[in-house]
């Protein structure tokens, strides 16, 4: 690992005092893996507080500036409309941006952007806007979704706006996807994913994380399996792919939110495990050695580092491990180095978005301990810094990329080794409606031996609206299973009343070929047949269930296609396969139990009217982890619905909300612990936004919501618990509260 390029005395000063370093001083304060170097791309005053970026076809950077985020430890001024979307350009060709244009200003905490056709999607909570681009100026503004990011704090709102290979736009911290069709915007339900940042691999599978988990991801393509709202989760989605959450900062990290807690820091006062994991990136640039291809890099701004993970596939499942122990791909001794997002670049380098500031913890959960750390080293200001770096092989000339506009030249780029270029070529063909290239695209489908090229050609045809059933049928027999899976996924776009019987016959042939790798995909896609012939789909459903009764991925895929008919199919399958230990029966029981939990019959309008402030607090503070239905969200938090922790002793509930809860917790006879949930609920004792009455109302609200029916909580109840435990900093454990 390349060492620090500054003397020991300067290192000690940087660690002790956290001074504001210039970009030229910041790079020598970093360690990067041997064989690589960090290069400056942009810095203040050209850019301020960046949180996300997109590259256009000219290699320019479109960046989001979230200038209003946490101006001080209580967030005063966060609602000032000072956020911007800017365009950065390197006009002299030296690799460093030297020109800035403001495309859009007066935004309140903007958080994501996406270039598409002749416009730009911009996420400005609660809205998602599409803004036409007229010669680099903002034109007509169209509201795409007024509830893109409703409520929640800045750490827990949707973001990402990733253009998937399947021509849909996906998000983190969201269960929605979007697509532009002519002048219309389509919105569909998808699986809930992640917290901050989202990425995809060469075949379009998605990867994400939450603040305490290194990497989560999907085994299957994102378009599938989100049709049955009764399923709390579908096997193969939101999988904990790298279970090792250790981090290895190169400086003491006492300035983390719970640095006071035992086990949070090691003996050298360095963070032990992720606490702000974000911005995952599947590296697809083709510039690094082949060993780095589809490695996943993860940012950790609290520990001032970027981690590298290596993935390994086994069938359709994926698991990974950290690339090495005891060190990181990139780390800094500069406390203000805050990598919050990572991107593949047109040149194949990794681009690091550095918010460069002292405060990154949002006020809702900011502890008094961290406030003192911030004050001790003067981390509140400045607020106008920001950097973009790129990591590239040391000494290697990295050339800027200008995308061609000729249709055939773009088709030729679908085989480029750089995934960013392939994606951009596909997007430009689709955005430009270049249907003249369909012969060349179909030639790729028939003749190319490169599975990545085949998949891009297929999805380009789909994006242009000219994919035909005849295009995908041969791909069902392709030697590469990912091509077969992609073709089965694309079937949703081409199955109609004329060809669904042929598709059903293809599914039977796939079953006969013992193609277990695509078994979940044919199960998911029964809904395509059911739209035209439900009895035919039902027969296939039973045949697949009988063939794969102990495959939980197939089981959940099948259940995803039978919303509101779960009991009927469960009785049928139990008659044929009575063994309750089989995966198909276990997954049915799980889904039916979730359905039962949701049958509360509560009058939500009446409850919201009775507790208006509580309804607002729940939406902003609680819903992002515990869900609208109170049944919890996978990888984040356990249920509140029918939880004895909620409906039981109100003093314990108040203590949890004020001081937090850490470690395993049992709800309805099920033990919830990391990685199924985050492993910690932060307390609200130090919140400047919520008083005792707000907390009392909110606890009354959840004790009487969903299937819960317990007594209310008063302001006096909250005060008594606060007086009992005072300024305790440690969160409770479940065992401690049982005493």
Q: What do these predicted regions represent?
A:
Residues 590-618:
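Electrostatic cytochrome c docking/interface patches
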Residues 3, 14-17, 599-609, 667-739:
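Flexible coil segments in periplasmic/lumen-exposed cytochrome c-class electron-transfer proteins
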Residues 397-399, 422-433, 452-466, 471-477, ...:
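Structural detector for internal amphipathic alpha-helices that build alpha-solenoid repeat scaffolds
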Residues 342, 353, 388-391, 614-628, ...:
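The canonical Cys-X-X-Cys-His
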Residues 417-418, 449-450, 479-480, 514-516, ...:
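Short inter-helical turns and helix N-cap capping residues of alpha-solenoid HEAT/ARM repeat scaffolds
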